[in-house]
Amino acid sequence: MNPSTLKPSHTHPSLLLPAPSPLRTQRRRFRVSLPRCSSDTNNPASSSSPPQRPPKELNGIEILVDKLSSPARLATSAVIVAGAVAAGYGLGSRFGGSRNAALGGAVALGAAGGAAAYALNAAAPQVAAVNLHNYVAGFDDPSILTREDIEVIANKYGVSKQDEAFKAEICDIYSEFVSSVIPPGGEELKGDEVDKIVNFKSSLGLDDPDAAAVHMEIGRKLFRQRLEVGDREGGVEQRRAFQKLIYVSNIVFGDASSFLLPWKRVFKVTESQVEVAIRDNAQRLYASKLKSVGRDFDLGKLVTLKETQSLCCLSDELAENLFREHARKLVEENISVALGILKSRTRAVPGVSQVVEEIEKVLAFNDLLISFKNHSDIDRLARGVGPVSLVGGEYDADRKIEDLKLLYRAYVSDALSSGRMEDNKFAALNQLKNIFGLGKREAEAILLDITRKVYRKRLGQTVSSGELEMADSKAAFLQNLCDELHFDPQKASELHEEIYRQKLQQCVADGELTDENVAALLKLRVMLCVPQQTVEAAHAEICGNLFEKIVKDAIASGVDGYDDETKKSVRKAAHGLRLTKETALSIASKAVRKMFITYVKRSRSAKGNGESAKELKKLIAFNTLVVTKLVEDIKGESPDVKIEEPKIEEPEEIRESEEYEMRITSDTQENKTGQRACRKDGKAWSDRITLKDDLPEKDRADLYKTFLTYCLTGDVVRIPFGVEIKKKKDDTEYIYLNQLGGILGLTGKVIMDVHRGLAEQAFRKQAEVLLADGQLTKARVEQLGKMQKEIGLSQEYAQKIIKNITTTKMAAAIETAVTQGKLNMKQIRELKESNVDLDSMVSVSLRETIFKKTVGDIFSSGTGEFDEEEVYEKIPLDLNINKEKARGVVCELAQNRLSNSLIQAVALLRQRNHKGVVFSLNNLLACDKAVPSQTLSWEVSEELSDLYTIYLKSDPSPEKLSRLQYLLGINDSTAAALRDSEDSLLETAEEEKFVF
């Protein structure tokens, strides 16, 4: 560089254009810019080029300093000082006339010359700064400024870069450069800002602390501009510019930024706000890099992206999300194009191939990313490399899933267009399912639907060409066809069944299967390998539905609609549809049982027992006139042949039961007579179809009981004036009853229980009236026996009812006596001797109450006796209560009564009731005998002595007297003295005053 060119000039405008050349006659000024607010964005000059800055000019002594080089300036300074000293000395000598005056003049003018020399040298840093400013302003690109250029200027003027003025100019240049490099708020970072700033800072030789101070000052300017902006939009732009400054500055200074850039302290921002600024700008910068790469990924670009991520200070998680989002958007572009073609109304056949082509691009792109994911140097590649997914994007919505299904269906159709599924296509379908995010069931449903159609088409072709029929192994042929289409053999079997069913429905369209139909079905079954079980199920369902419809039509008209034409149609259907008798009867049974249930519902909803029985009679008539004929026609039996009704036999266990014979003795003859009459009329009924599995046994028994009650009571006719007349019972009702039992599917035991229950109910009502007082006399026994025979109840059940009634009455009386306290142990033992079961009549709690009352009576009897065997053994045995629990009751009562007896004895003593005193003391001794006690305490010992004296006079036994002495705590000497002076003690006791 030629230092002679470093001359201050304000005649050359400065522009940020290509680097200057020393030989150029025209130089441009260096212009810098700060981010503008929104109010300045409307000005083209503010957005396209920074405002011009005027050059700096030298004034006064600065011009002289600029003319002199550093040595010349120093020499000039020396000359000035020396000249001033010499002039001062000369003037002092001339005017002062003495040596001292000469020296004074030399000092004075020397000082002035030194000041002038100092001023000349002090202006050098400012002159150097102005020349540096004007020199840089002449560059089109200030980044070409080097450290050597700055040193040349500094050396020319003999200044240091640390001089305040020179250093301030360097910082201003750096500030303008940083402000020009960082784009304004509305623009995004390009990614080269950090390198430019770092290189320029190095060129200037600026230390990190000084450079950091410049960054903070730029931040203050942006912060002030944000506060000065009046609109919200401008504030947002300034905030974004401030965020970019934070992001770029943190990268420029690296780890040192934590203490060199005090954003939080100076600008009162939080740590999270700083992190957000760094994160958002890093994301935008990395996203712009991804956008520039596009879909042309290779190993080198992925490595570059990884390096870019590191330079951007972007976390792996965010980089991974951005990469996946970029890949998803690329795939979404292909999907949108494919959907546009697929949904186009003017789409032609070539359009389908274009749709498939777009999907192939998606699959190829996905395969490319998967291959990079499996790379050995995956850590050196960009984060997020892997399978593409549409989750979180435009097509991750319920309303978009149908569009993806359309594309998936189109690709499946294309994959099967050749009549087979290639392995690579099958694998691609799985990848496409994962990319689209389709569920397993959704994808399988689409694949199954199209594969079924293709399989059915190829199956039809093989059948038409005879290829399948000529195959040696039809199962192997079909299996091979499934393998070519990747079709599940189980689904193929279901399709075969569907085809067979369709063929069967075509064959039975006219209501019967001809021999030709049977042969065709057999041939189809063999070719399709349809199992016999499946064939039977299909026949049972399809033919069964036809037969069921005919049966329903036959029975819908009721008892009068089953005519010859109906019979003919039933026979034709039963035999023409090739149904087995069991299958046909099973189908007919369902329809018939529904009609039975209808009659049952009507019977239940009827108001009275008679109306309910009439509905049941309709049920019986329907069974006789319709169901029986229907069963005959299904079985193929001739209606002209009389069908002898089988002899009704009851089950063996009932037939051998004595009670059963006694129960139906009176009804058997009527029943048999009615059956014979029915057989003479040639009317038979069938019990082939019953309600055994349709109604609970209890409900069926109730229906039977309803009709049985009707048979016993007969019809009731109401005539005017509220009079009811019972019609004479008809024997045929019992035949209907027998048929109803068969229709209901009741066993002989259940029927027997119903009959016996009614008999017991009738006998119980009459017996309760007769035994109202609970007394069973001989006359009443005879009367009850007569009633038993009339009703037909066995002796065993009659005795149980009688015993139950008498026992209930007696139990109520005994319970009342116990509650009122009128029942003692003597009476209880008399009842037990009379074989009265007290355990069932009297509850355990009441028996325990009796025991407690009995023990209480013993402790209050005044005898002073307690029989342990009686209380602990005999009484609990008679009452059938727990002995250990009884002992506990005795102990509790004895302990309570013991102290109470002493208190009662003292009270009676104070009342001078000597007899009562002896009575209470005997109770005390009885309680003590049951539960031995310690010596009792009493506050007034004289009263205890009086009690002993009074008891002594009652002439007790020595054992009782000795025990009482112990309980009252009277020693032997006192007892002897009391015996000797009993008369005087009594007289003294009469004179005492008792305070109550």
UniProtKB/Swiss-Prot annotation:
GO terms under biological process? protein import into chloroplast stroma
Q: What is expression of this protein induced or repressed by?
A: Down-regulated by cold stress.
Q: Which InterPro entries match?
A: TIC110
- Could you tell me the superkingdom of the organism this chain comes from? Eukaryota
**PTM (free text):** Contains at least one interchain redox-active disulfide bond.
Output the Gene Ontology cellular-component terms: chloroplast inner membrane; TOC-TIC supercomplex I
Which segments does the topology annotation call Stromal? Answer: 38-73, 121-244, 368-613, 720-996
Fill in the subunit field for this protein.
Answer: Part of the Tic complex. Interacts with TIC32, HSP93 and CPN60. Interacts with the Toc complex components TOC75 and TOC159. Binds specifically chloroplast pre-proteins.
Q: Write out the similarity annotation.
A: Belongs to the chloroplast envelope anion channel-forming Tic110 (TC 1.A.18) family.
Misc note:
PubMed:9632730 shows that the region 121-996 is located in the stroma while PubMed:18986981 indicates that it contains probably 4 trans-membrane domains resulting in 2 regions in the intermembrane space localized to form supercomplexes with the TOC machinery and to receive the transit peptide of pre-proteins.
Q: What is known of its domains?
A: The N1 region (38-149) is sufficient for re-targeting to the inner membrane and proper insertion. The N2 region (150-269) may act as a start transfer signal, but it cannot direct proteins to the inner envelope.
The protein depicted here goes by the name Protein TIC110, chloroplastic
What organism does this protein naturally occur in?
Answer: Pisum sativum
